[in-house]
A protein has these predicted regions:
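Cofactor-binding beta-sheet edge motifs in enzyme active sites
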Residues: 2-204
């Protein structure tokens, strides 16, 4: 089986794989193309010849009109130094219902990476501009103070699998869901620890 991908001479135009849609779009396209090939083979009575069969499928997933979402819950324990205003993450647990998980290892790493981005938004990262020139004062990764794995504890990720997904084998969107909850979870933990509700990010 030869898969044609990443060739702009042979593949249709695509806006790229982003927005947590790689598994859904690519996975469904592969499944549908293979199903078409299987149908062609069945129509020819399972021949043993050297003919080449070509199966195609749309990269746009089709649904029955039902909106399906992934659901998540994050728990975070923080330590706040009220003297100098710093916050340290002590424990982080993320529970995600993302349909059927096709590759648990990469799915967990996606959730961890997205969660670290969300923690960075909550505690460190800021986009500052010079009020006179309008030029950014935090260009690049270094000045923006992006978090690294050394800055956060191990993030415990648990998946609750259901067969309600519209993707291949019941998969759902998962990649970016961790970044949505993390800032709110951290802000709520800081508010619970200090009694002060934060209304802007980063929390300082």
């Amino acid at each position: 089986v030869e898969v044609v991908w990443g060739d702009t001479d042979r593949c249709p135009y695509s806006v790229g794989e982003s927005g947590s849609r790689t598994t859904i779009q690519t996975g469904l396209a592969v499944v549908q193309a293979v199903e078409e090939l299987r149908s062609q083979i069945a129509d020819q009575g399972m021949p043993n010849g050297g003919d080449v069969l070509i199966g195609t499928a749309t990269p746009v997933p089709t649904t029955d009109g039902k909106t399906r979402q992934c659901f998540c819950a994050h728990y975070v324990e923080v330590e706040v130094d009220t003297r100098i205003g710093t916050t340290r993450i002590l424990k982080y647990t993320a529970v995600h219902e993302s349909g059927r998980i096709i590759n648990p290892t990469t799915a967990r790493d996606q959730i961890r990476g997205a969660t670290i981005q969300g923690i960075g938004q909550a505690l460190h990262e800021d986009l500052l501009y010079d009020s006179d020139s309008g030029q950014p004062l935090t260009p690049g990764y270094y000045r923006a103070r992006h978090l690294t794995h050394q800055d956060v504890p191990d993030i415990d990720v648990t998946f609750i699998e259901v067969d309600d997904g519209y993707g291949p084998f019941g998969a759902k969107t998962a990649g970016e869901s961790g970044i949505i909850l993390a800032p709110a979870a951290v802000a709520n933990a800081v508010a619970n620890a200090t009694g002060n509700r934060m209304t802007s990010l980063p929390i300082t």
